[in-house]
UniProtKB/Swiss-Prot annotation:
It comes from Methanothrix thermoacetophila (strain DSM 6194 / JCM 14653 / NBRC 101360 / PT) (Methanosaeta thermophila). Belongs to the CetZ family. The gene is cetZ. GO terms for molecular function: GTP binding; GTPase activity. Its main location: cytoplasm. SUPFAM superfamilies: Tubulin nucleotide-binding domain-like. This is Tubulin-like protein CetZ. PANTHER family: CELL DIVISION PROTEIN FTSZ-RELATED, TUBULIN-LIKE PROTEIN CETZ. One of its GO terms (cellular component) is cytoplasm. Involved in cell shape control. Gene3D superfamilies: Tubulin/FtsZ, GTPase domain. GTP binds at Q11, C12, G13, N14, R15, S111, G115, T116, G117, E148, N176, N194.
Length: 367
């Protein structure tokens, strides 16, 4: 049995964790008080935040699984303030995590653009790696809508770089900007994106801890996530009775519409993959699955496959590591502009203010 820890850090991470618990508890707001989570593994969940109101809004996460970092009321998207808050409270945070026991797999779910999540997460991963030396630690990094503002863009750029520098075991990217086009307005986009992430993570956890006809395990997952850029994404597709073709289901799980971050597999943007196929035995033709997996190796360097017999139409989860990420290059170009824009605005405002002050340089107060 796998021991899994899921940390939701900051508002975005908290909401993804709440979506995980909603699906794990079965969707009832009251279920968290009397039901057991529907995990095959031992899974611990903790929502961490500096803003207590963000924790209060969670509907499916039990009170014991909410950790408020005291003496802070959010950090106002200021990563410097957030880092200071983490260092001042790190022992309290890590002690709460260590109470939950040992873990084989740790997910750190966060927005890379806000305040608490983007400042806490790289530092937390660094500390967790020292304390859980044998655990696989993977951040779920949510990229911002590009129109959210200059501060969020610069936060995203620095947080992503720091997550790579602390040497997490790969990183799963989720791109709000990309996924928004499937969800309409921003409010409904947030809910849909959180649900999509939760669905894929729960499928992954279940697959890693299931008896399989063809086996993939945590070691395979780690190998995939450490490939290429050490950044990856998750894809998903569920077939129906009208079109239960297993080969089509595998293909569709790799199409951009099913991915959390856009990757053109046919153009060689994926370096490694783990494909997990689940469904009733009648749909799972091993020869057809093998042929499709072999065809994928023409564009993907190495593909692990797992087959899980479970009643229902085929469902496919794809885990991809990225060889190229043009969208990230574009994000960093925008972040560079955002940083320069912020600096110029500050300099301009200060210059205007000092010019105003100069008008009274030769004057004294008169009463």
């Amino acid at each position: 049995m796998l021991n899994v820890l899921m940390l939701g850090v900051g508002q975005c991470g908290n909401r993804i964790l709440d979506a995980v618990n909603r699906q794990a508890f079965g969707g009832s707001r009251l279920a968290k008080y009397y039901s057991k989570q529907r995990f095959p593994s031992r899974v611990e969940t903790i929502a961490i935040n500096t803003a207590i109101n963000d924790l209060k809004e969670l509907k499916f996460t039990a009170a014991k699984d909410r950790l408020h970092v005291p003496n802070l009321h959010g950090v106002g998207a200021n990563r410097s303030k957030g880092k200071q808050g983490f260092w001042e409270n790190q022992e309290m945070i890590l002690e709460e995590i260590e109470k939950r026991g040992d873990f084989d797999l740790i997910f750190v779910m966060t927005s890379v653009s806000g305040g608490t999540g983007s400042s806490f997460s790289p530092l937390m991963i660094h500390e967790l790696k020292k304390r859980y030396k044998n655990a696989t630690i993977v951040p779920i990094a949510v990229l911002p809508f590009r129109e959210e503002g200059t501060i969020y863009l610069q936060n995203a750029a620095f947080c992503l770089r720091e997550m790579i520098e602390v040497e997490a075991d790969g990183m799963i990217l989720v791109d709000n900007q990309y996924l928004k086009r499937f969800s309409g307005d921003i409010a409904s986009a947030y809910d849909r994106i959180n649900t999509m992430v939760a669905q894929r993570l729960l499928f992954l956890i279940e697959a890693l801890d299931s008896e399989m006809l063809s086996v993939t395990d945590l070691g395979d997952f780690k190998t995939v996530m450490n490939g290429g850029l050490r950044m990856g994404t998750l894809g998903y597709y569920q077939a129906d009775k009208k079109s239960p073709s297993i080969r089509a289901a595998i293909k569709n799980s790799l199409r951009e519409v099913g991915l959390l971050y856009p990757a053109n597999v046919d153009a060689g943007e994926a370096g490694r993959a783990m494909i997990v196929i689940q469904g009733s035995r009648e749909y799972l033709n091993v020869d057809e699955i093998t042929k499709e997996i072999e065809s994928l190796t023409e564009t993907i360097g190495h593909v692990f496959k797992g087959i899980v017999i479970k009643k229902g139409e085929p469902r496919v989860l794809s885990v991809l590591s990225l060889e190229r990420a043009p969208g990230l290059v574009e994000l960093y170009e925008k972040a560079k502009w955002a940083i320069q824009e912020e600096r110029e605005r500050k300099d301009r405002a200060r210059s205007e203010l000092y010019e105003a002050f100069e008008q009274i340089n030769d004057l004294e107060e008169i009463y």
